[in-house]
Amino acid sequence: MKKLPSRVFLVLLFTLLLAFSLHGQLDPGGELQYLQGSDGAIYFYAQVQGIIPVYLWVDFPQLQNLEPSSPFPQGWVIPPTLSEQEELQSSLLSLLPEAPPEDLEIPPDGLILFSLRPKANSSTRFQIQFRYTYGIPMDPRSHDHLYLFPFPHGTKFQVTQGFNGSFTHFGENQYALDFDLGVGDPIHAARSGRVIGVKEDSNRGGASSSFASYGNYILVYHDDGSFGNYVHLRQNGALVEVGDWVEAGQLLGYSGNTGQASGPHLHFDVRVPTSDGQFKSIPVRFVSLYGEIIDPEVGKSYYAVHPGGQPFVPVFGDDIRDEDFAGYLEAVPRGDSLEIRTEVVDSTTLVFLQNTYNQAYWVEISLSLTNLLSTQGSRIIREVPAQTEVFLTLLRPANPERGWSHRIQYRFRPLP
């Protein structure tokens, strides 16, 4: 930076406001520099290299005895290619009150954005804040794309935290979704786009917000300017690289438990840049198994259906009824015990009782339930034939957003 004239006393205070997500760093890493020209004005220029447009937001919380060439706060969309930047530069220079001095040593990739011109015989002072983000600011209400569920075709996973979730889904993550994928489960692209961010070096995770920056992620830029954000991947769990084009349904990587997470899962959201250089998640809808539009709900499980996928037979826990087991009697090997057997389909638990004795028994079953409802009540009495399994009840959560548990006790006596 060239020296300022002796008549000017200038205090420079820079603040870089990073576009930081709870679930990953989304800052494209641009620079904002300045030089003083021989005309006394201070010229600010950007240096950005990328594969998609970048938005730079600038404000001056303090500006004393300096005349800006543009009103503030102000934002600029900086295109990724040098040819496009040169075209933008021509229009920006036309907005300056005077052309920059010819001896101003701006780097070849520097894009002059604005200037500050000191007022005569005055001490000057300014504080500047700026923020780079990917993409072009847009109206978050203008998106109506239907997404694929981000897991393999024919598989089903549950929404464990939805829009406005109390654990982490607020602020810019207001419209995020958590799916109960386990460590190593495949993640697939919910929509086609260009990969513009990958982090996969972390092996740290936990429920505290102190782990937020450790979340591995893949960030995909869509053709309408929105971004698909896939978070909590396992270490070295990304199969794509920055610059790759991915198709909807394509395998991206593997789920994990990194970053701020109380357990393994996939965090997915769609976000758009805002005019103040930040990000805002937007509500998303998905294509259902039967081609209908789905607004995802906490506690419900959904099948992924991808174009070209093989037909499969779906099974939903919510569709199971006691009537499906009317007259159910299943032979079991001979043994010396009464045993409870359970099956879990989505958030529905099917409860069976096996009598492996070579004798029929009268059995009274008592259920101790936490946040669960039994379709047969908490006390069930059954006569169970020898070496036979019988159906007892269905258990479903009263509130899918809370945890649930059950304890089953029974007493029995042989039938004459």
Task: Name these PLM-found stretches.
Residues 67-121, 372-401:
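Intrinsically disordered, low-complexity Pro/Gly/Ser/Thr-rich segments with frequent PxxP/GP/PP motifs
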Residues 10-19:
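Bacterial N-terminal signal peptides
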Residues 182, 188, 225-249:
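Short histidine-centered loop motifs in beta-beta connectors
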Residues 45-52, 62, 353-357:
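Asparagine-centered strand-capping/turn motif at beta-strand->loop junctions
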Residues 145-147, 151, 160, 239-241, ...:
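Acidic, glycine-rich catalytic/binding loops that coordinate metals and/or anionic ligands
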Residues 52-60, 69-71, 189, 360-367:
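Short, hydrophobic/aromatic beta-strand segments
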Residues 247-259:
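Short hydrophobic beta/alpha edge segments that flank linear recognition/processing sites
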Residues 105-108, 112-215, 321-343, 359-360, ...:
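Surface-exposed, glycine-biased beta-strand/turn segments
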